[in-house]
Amino acid sequence: MERNFVLSCCSTVDLPYAYMARRDIPVLFYHYVVGDQEYVDDMGRDPAALPRFYGFLKEGKLPQTSQVNVAAYLDFFEEQLKKGDLLHIAFTSGQSGSVHNAMTAGKLLQEKYPDKKIVVIDSLCSSSGYGLLVDTAADMRDSGATLEETAQWVLDNRNKVHHQFFSSDMTQFRRTGRVSGAAAMVATIMNICPIMRLDDKGAIKAYGKVRGKKKAVVTTVNAMEEHAQGGRDYDQKCFVCHSQCPEDARMLIDALEERFPKLKGKIRLCDIGTIIGSHSGPGTVAVFFMGDERPAMD
């Protein structure tokens, strides 16, 4: 299929690489480091990569992530420009400064190739919510929308992609300093699951806590009903992802399909990749959907 422009993104979309390849969406891969060894956030290309990563966490090793530098973006963008004009949707600035390097690279290449269109957009989205935004942009591209039309849709709708999630394992939150050791211990003893979402700047915010996974699922489903476009009649894209807890993800999907009948059999299930997993750790389950404008949160 001939397309009007190239649409690209980063590996933190937490969708399978094979799916992105089928959709003709080039991906810039993030990396993480354990000890003195660097590993790629490979999106399922190597079946051993994700178990190896979570094995590191189980051993108490702390993966280090870093921003993608300008040089890496220059190389990636220049390769894409061989195929046409470029729209790159970047990982949220609320969790990484990489988008600023992407924008710098875009400006440098715009000067080098003045006849090309190069647009870089901060997605304000993360994980498979970021994936949902990119996937919908690909639908527009494939339906014949121009780069400008697609970019404007992304800008208008990026803050309508809701990210609702909970975690039943506070270990990695403690290791990365997001919660204190005492708070993590109490949460574990009391079986407390923090309820979280992304704010309007694409940053993670905790806004509640419940005891037990079942209550966490109900709270998450209630939040989706409150914010989803159409309420219980929601019938747009819906992605669920998890970090090494498929049974919990299945429990959430079952509850979503019961509450939102038009989603039955249509929810895409994905793994949380190594970059997002470096911060969430195991035991996190999330749902992503289109809704009203995400609120600002202190």
Per-range role (PLM):
Residues 2-4, 12-33, 37, 87, ...:
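Mixed-charge interfacial surface used for oligomerization/domain docking
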Residues 6-68, 72:
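N-terminal glycine-rich anion-binding loop in soluble enzyme alpha/beta folds
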Residues 47-54, 77, 81, 108:
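A short glycine/small-residue-enriched secondary-structure motif
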Residues 72-99:
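N-terminal glycine-rich phosphate/adenylate-binding segment common to multiple enzyme folds
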Residues 111:
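Arginine/glycine-rich "motif VI" loop of SF2 helicases in the C-terminal RecA-like domain
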